[in-house]
Amino acid sequence: MADLAPKYNPNEVEKGRYQEWLDEDLFKPSGDKKAHPYSIVIPPPNVTGKLHLGHAWDTAIQDTLIRFKRMQGYDTLYLPGMDHAGIATQAKVEAKLRTQGKDRHEMGREAFVKQVWDWKDEYASIIKSQWAKMGLSLDYSRERFTLDKGLSKAVRKVFVQLYNEGLIYRGEYIINWDPKLETALSDIEVIHKDDKGAFYHIKYPFADGSGFVEIATTRPETMFGDTAVAVAPGDERYKDIVGKELVLPLVGRHIPIIEDQHVDPEFGTGLVKITPAHDPNDFQVGNRHNLERINVMNDNGTMNEEAGKYAGMDRFEAREALVKDLKEEGFLIKVEPIVHSVGHSERSGVQVEPRLSKQWFVKMKPLAEKVLENQKTDDKVNFVPERFEHTLEQWMSDVHDWVISRQLWWGHRIPAWYNKKTGETYVGLEAPKDSENWEQDPDVLDTWFSSALWPFSTLGWPDENSEDFKRYFPTNTLVTGYDIIFFWVSRMIFQSLHFTGKRPFDDVVLHGLIRDPQGRKMSKSLGNGVDPMDVVDEYGADALRWFLLNGTAPGQDTRYDPKKMGAAWNFINKIWNASRFVIMNLPEDAKPAHMPDTSKFDLADSWIFDRLNHTVSEVTRLFDEYQFGEAGRELYNFIWNDFCDWYIEISKVALNGDDEELKTRKQENLIWILDQILRLLHPIMPFVTEKLWLSMPHDGKSIMVAKYPETHKEFENKEADSQMAFLIEVIKAVRNIRMEVNAPMSSPIDIMIQIDDDNNKAVLDNNAEYVENFLHPKALSVAADIEAPKLAKTAVIPGAQIFVPLTELVNVDEELAKMEKEEKRLEAEVERAEKKLSNQGFVAHAPEAVINKEKEKKADYESQLAGVRERMKELKESK
């Protein structure tokens, strides 16, 4: 048995332990073919930077499940890996290069991509060190990266097959364009937020000089691409002008007035400018009326030659200059300020530009229908909480085609080639044989395209005979945040169903966001982010893991709070001290925990083993149901309250006594319960439980592969549970009375207990030593009828009324003098609060929160005053 430090020090406990686990190969699957497989593939973090608290939350839950199942005898695989994160990583590297005065276009594709690989290697190393500090039991022999050779092969196969099935196509459509990163974005990579803007009301003159129509737009700079003005069919106001031509202000080009169902006659003037190359609705109108598509912007958001003298200006500078010119030329009617929802790039933060572009798309409807159909079967993906299944189905029911090409250099290059002479398109797993005659598409695939294949591509697919694919796919549980259901979860489901015919995972466990103590989302702009490694350095990985799992429910946000981290450390320190006490009280030749003899149990033994049985049953059930917060509460109550506060204290009498046989029994009971507690806690707190378990008599090389606790029928004893609960209530009631009258534990007291029935009397008579050992009474009376003393404190509990005479504890005259002084103080406080609240100036000008606080203070003082007066009445009556 090892000596334990008097205080829990997480840095000492965790130092070197992870490497020992790796050296012992404890993270690899058992290889036991008779065991049920249980697999989790880690949601691959982006190699953009270090992990944040959200990643820590993800992985704490995943590793808890893996360790739990491993101890239950499952053949577990926890597969690590990382995501290349196309846009995000390229943006980071470009920003770094800019600080060095370098530009990727000047460097060239090959040199730039090498820089990104260097970045990836640096941050992958950091991420792996963070995984180690969190104690994640990952099988690194199976580590994957989304640009690995095997995963790249899977990506190409999926692209080619979907293309051959007509589910991938290339076309010119309106897409979301990021002018800063100069790439297309999918709809869910666009974040809408309210911006200040304006409706610019502009005159569009008739070509025949007969007047003008008024057009309102929020994007006047796109007018250079206008090819029509539309009105609603049958709009009586404009029936006479349909077919007439207008002159585009400052441009001079003629455009027709057309009718189209897109126009809402109730909105604005009922006249809409149509810009087919810069608006998705206008694009559809243009298709219906065969209108020209005029693109007026460059890739970087500057105006092109179509904008005339504004060419080369940034789109917003051009807007300002154009509006000024429209005003000077008499075309601007008015500017109406508004606040409207505008799309912004999730990655760069700039306003997205709807823009005509030739891109690759996935036809989503047939794939979405597979998901919706599968969710009606027994083989559906189960969501925890269940409400998120509706979120998935809602999105799949109204899904749009997915733009998958990105104008980047970092990522999976699209496996499409164009013939240099004929323009013919070739899509294949490899380049055409006469590759010198072909040019590969320069674009790469959306990061989420490869991430969508993660659960099966990491296990060997497309080789469906791969041992890992056959054994561990579908995976069992996906743990992730609810904020990426659309980005990732949904896409994994439809790709898996389409290519493997199976769901990718049985269950999806969704957690919320980690917010700061004020409930705000953590962000760089607010400066309220928390580095999980700083938390680990201060409190330890086990404390962080406990915080992340305890007190949270699936699907709910949580708040990071240093006070809660302190409480987590305190709990582990309590476990440490309890373990140290038990180990120090064992004989040198103590044997590992073994099943105790229940026939020799006293009441406290029967009670604690029944409570242990209940805890094992509940924690196992709650882990299986992913209710980790509830499981944490069960563990906390049993360990802190039942075991530490009561059973250890009760056991001290026997451990310090002369009865060697009783002492041995208590030692054996304590080591069994401690062993079971450490096993119960291990999935959540791997480091400290390993240290403590190896410090006590044990069988096996690691608690990680020890058997998870199970219930034992012989430990069930509900009668002992209720009897001990009654005794505890008696002891707590008397302790509370001592506190109320400021009587120290050493002061002698009489305890008089009036009981309601013979059963409770028997409990007290047969177990009086518990009351005596905890309360040290001068005299203990237990009876059905007791005459209440004149001066006494009373407590009522289920089944009994308790009296503690105060004559020997209280000097009545001294106590009365103290109470009178307190009465005057409280009367003054009540009077002060009343004056303040009756002051009209205070009530009229003070914030509502301040007024309510003052009202609360007054009510509190009044309550205290009533208590003091009641106490004074009791004291006077006793004289």
Curated annotation (Swiss-Prot):
<dbReference type="GO" id="GO:0005524">
    <property type="term" value="F:ATP binding"/>
</dbReference>
<dbReference type="GO" id="GO:0006438">
    <property type="term" value="P:valyl-tRNA aminoacylation"/>
</dbReference>
<dbReference type="Pfam" id="PF08264">
    <property type="entry name" value="Anticodon_1"/>
</dbReference>
<dbReference type="InterPro" id="IPR002303">
    <property type="entry name" value="Valyl-tRNA_ligase"/>
</dbReference>
<protein>
    <recommendedName>
        <fullName>Valine--tRNA ligase</fullName>
        <ecNumber>6.1.1.9</ecNumber>
    </recommendedName>
</protein>
<feature type="short sequence motif" description="'HIGH' region">
    <location>
        <begin position="45"/>
        <end position="55"/>
    </location>
</feature>
<keyword id="KW-0030">Aminoacyl-tRNA synthetase</keyword>
<keyword id="KW-0547">Nucleotide-binding</keyword>
<dbReference type="InterPro" id="IPR010978">
    <property type="entry name" value="tRNA-bd_arm"/>
</dbReference>
<dbReference type="GO" id="GO:0005829">
    <property type="term" value="C:cytosol"/>
</dbReference>
<dbReference type="InterPro" id="IPR009080">
    <property type="entry name" value="tRNAsynth_Ia_anticodon-bd"/>
</dbReference>
<keyword id="KW-0648">Protein biosynthesis</keyword>
<keyword id="KW-0963">Cytoplasm</keyword>
<feature type="coiled-coil region">
    <location>
        <begin position="806"/>
        <end position="879"/>
    </location>
</feature>
<dbReference type="GO" id="GO:0004832">
    <property type="term" value="F:valine-tRNA ligase activity"/>
</dbReference>
<dbReference type="InterPro" id="IPR019499">
    <property type="entry name" value="Val-tRNA_synth_tRNA-bd"/>
</dbReference>
<keyword id="KW-0436">Ligase</keyword>
<dbReference type="GO" id="GO:0002161">
    <property type="term" value="F:aminoacyl-tRNA deacylase activity"/>
</dbReference>
<dbReference type="Pfam" id="PF00133">
    <property type="entry name" value="tRNA-synt_1"/>
</dbReference>
<dbReference type="InterPro" id="IPR001412">
    <property type="entry name" value="aa-tRNA-synth_I_CS"/>
</dbReference>
<dbReference type="Pfam" id="PF10458">
    <property type="entry name" value="Val_tRNA-synt_C"/>
</dbReference>
<comment type="similarity">
    <text>Belongs to the class-I aminoacyl-tRNA synthetase family. ValS type 1 subfamily.</text>
</comment>
<feature type="short sequence motif" description="'KMSKS' region">
    <location>
        <begin position="521"/>
        <end position="525"/>
    </location>
</feature>
<keyword id="KW-0067">ATP-binding</keyword>
<dbReference type="InterPro" id="IPR033705">
    <property type="entry name" value="Anticodon_Ia_Val"/>
</dbReference>
<feature type="binding site">
    <location>
        <position position="524"/>
    </location>
    <ligand>
        <name>ATP</name>
    </ligand>
</feature>
<comment type="subunit">
    <text>Monomer.</text>
</comment>
<dbReference type="InterPro" id="IPR002300">
    <property type="entry name" value="aa-tRNA-synth_Ia"/>
</dbReference>
<dbReference type="InterPro" id="IPR009008">
    <property type="entry name" value="Val/Leu/Ile-tRNA-synth_edit"/>
</dbReference>
<keyword id="KW-0175">Coiled coil</keyword>
<dbReference type="InterPro" id="IPR013155">
    <property type="entry name" value="M/V/L/I-tRNA-synth_anticd-bd"/>
</dbReference>
<comment type="function">
    <text>Catalyzes the attachment of valine to tRNA(Val). As ValRS can inadvertently accommodate and process structurally similar amino acids such as threonine, to avoid such errors, it has a 'posttransfer' editing activity that hydrolyzes mischarged Thr-tRNA(Val) in a tRNA-dependent manner.</text>
</comment>
<dbReference type="InterPro" id="IPR037118">
    <property type="entry name" value="Val-tRNA_synth_C_sf"/>
</dbReference>
<dbReference type="InterPro" id="IPR014729">
    <property type="entry name" value="Rossmann-like_a/b/a_fold"/>
</dbReference>
